[in-house]
From Swiss-Prot:
Gene3D superfamilies linked to this entry: 2.30.30.790
Gene Ontology cellular-component annotations: cytosolic large ribosomal subunit
Function: This protein is located at the 30S-50S ribosomal subunit interface and may play a role in the structure and function of the aminoacyl-tRNA binding site.
Protein's UniProt name: Large ribosomal subunit protein bL19
Record-level Gene Ontology MF annotations: structural constituent of ribosome
Gene encoding the protein: rplS
Keyword Ribosomal protein: yes
Record's keyword terms, sorted: Ribonucleoprotein, Ribosomal protein
Protein family per UniProt: Belongs to the bacterial ribosomal protein bL19 family.
InterPro entries: Ribosomal_bL19 (IPR001857), Ribosomal_bL19_CS (IPR018257), Ribosomal_bL19_sf (IPR038657), Translation_prot_SH3-like_sf (IPR008991)
NCBIfam families for the chain: rplS_bact
The keyword Heme is annotated on this UniProt entry: no
GO biological process: translation
Amino acid sequence: MNLIQELEKEQLDKLATGKTIPDFGPGDTVTVNVKVKEGDRTRVQAYEGVCIGRNGGGINESFTVRKISYGEGVERVFPIYSPMIDSIKLVRRGKVRRAKLYYLRGRRGKSARIVEKQDQRQTTTAAAAAE
């Protein structure tokens, strides 16, 4: 491992302590709690939407979240290890077959919906427990 990779790994370990980042990908609905500074006080603002892609790797990894706010599509890019992110929560998993969901930009209403992923193991264990 070269020197830059070692330094990045050290910084990544330092930034990741105390944070739990769920395993999510494109199509998943996530809630990102962002620290917003207004004057001299800081508050936490929730931003919920569909993850339409993840970029980069390691310490430079980021993800894009898209939501519809008052009829307008709003996209925001968050670095995963940003100190401005308070927490990331996975709301639901989506069933998609693409790594980047940029086609959602041109869609509205029902055509922009993403089907929820049904985990086969959870349904079979729930059915077995019911019997």
